[in-house]
A protein has these predicted regions:
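An exposed acidic His-Trp-rich patch
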Residues: 96-179, 183
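N-terminal secretory signal peptides
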Residues: 1-19, 23-29, 39-93
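Long, solvent-exposed, polar/charged low-complexity segments
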Residues: 50-52, 144-247
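An acidic- and aromatic-residue-enriched active-site/binding cleft used to recognize and process polar
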Residues: 25, 64, 107-110
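Boundary at the C-terminal end of the N-terminal hydrophobic targeting segment
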Residues: 34-35
């Protein structure tokens, strides 16, 4: 189950894996690939994109340049055959619908898995606590109740994201891949980016934030942007004991 192992209980327990999979619609599911080129193959191969997926929308920023921010669409599989239940993998796009540009990939692990990573590896992973509690992360295909359950589940997860198309305004991917970081405190987001996202999905980040604060029961995190590419992420506080504050 994707839940933070080192902290608190939420006002309602997060979903177990069965409940989580039940929420995932077959968004972006692909038809099985035919195997006509192999006469001995009677059954078609299944596409890696087939099966239950979740779509959620967040605001990404570049770790090396926190002012570089853009709305990013995530299409994530919850069953990767990775050998454990604490791993998702996501394809990232600049928009929904046909013609969207493939920006990159993101991998998501539980807090328990993150804690076991080598120290040198952790600099690539960003926290999701502020994205959830600040209202920046939404799941457009879910009902409000299901979205809340989902957000409680991913609250303390960590993501490793690279944008291999660093500037979606270019006709083709130009430049080196961008290591992506997360917004982690009030005042860090570009309000124009938030406003554009809210208009597109007809939602209110402020109302989402208020509802999640009430349901989850924690203050929003307050973590400064990374000083450099080697900085490690934190989930709740800028220094000291990295634990949440109850409302």
């Amino acid at each position: 189950m994707l839940s933070g192992g080192h902290i608190m209980s939420l006002r309602e327990p997060p979903m177990d894996r069965r409940e989580l999979l039940a929420l995932f619609g077959a968004i972006g599911a692909a038809a099985p690939l035919a195997a006509d080129d192999h006469e001995g193959k009677k059954e078609p191969h299944a596409s890696p994109l087939a099966g239950p997926h979740a779509h959620f929308c967040g605001i990404h920023m570049a770790k090396k340049d926190p002012k570089f921010q853009l709305v990013t669409q995530h299409y994530c599989t919850a069953d990767t055959q990775a050998g454990h239940d604490d791993f998702f993998q996501c394809i990232l796009f600049d928009r929904t619908g046909p013609g969207a540009k493939l920006l990159g990939v993101e991998y998501i692990v539980s807090d328990a898995v993150y804690r076991k990573l080598p120290e040198e590896e952790k600099k690539y992973w960003h926290a999701h606590t502020y994205e959830v509690l600040g209202g920046g992360l939404i799941a457009p295909g879910m009902t409000p109740d299901d979205e809340m359950k989902f957000m409680k589940t991913i609250l303390t997860t960590w993501g490793k994201a690279w944008h291999t198309w660093p500037d979606p305004s270019t006709a083709v991917p130009i430049g080196e891949p961008l290591l992506i970081w997360s917004l982690m405190a009030d005042g860090q987001v570009d309000e124009k980016v938030v406003a554009a996202r809210d208009r597109e999905f007809k939602c209110s980040t402020a109302k989402i934030r208020a509802a999640r604060a009430e349901a989850i029961g924690f203050e929003v995190p307050n973590v400064a942007p990374p000083k450099d590419l080697n900085a490690l992420g934190r989930q709740w506080t800028n220094d000291g004991d990295d634990k949440p504050k109850k409302k």
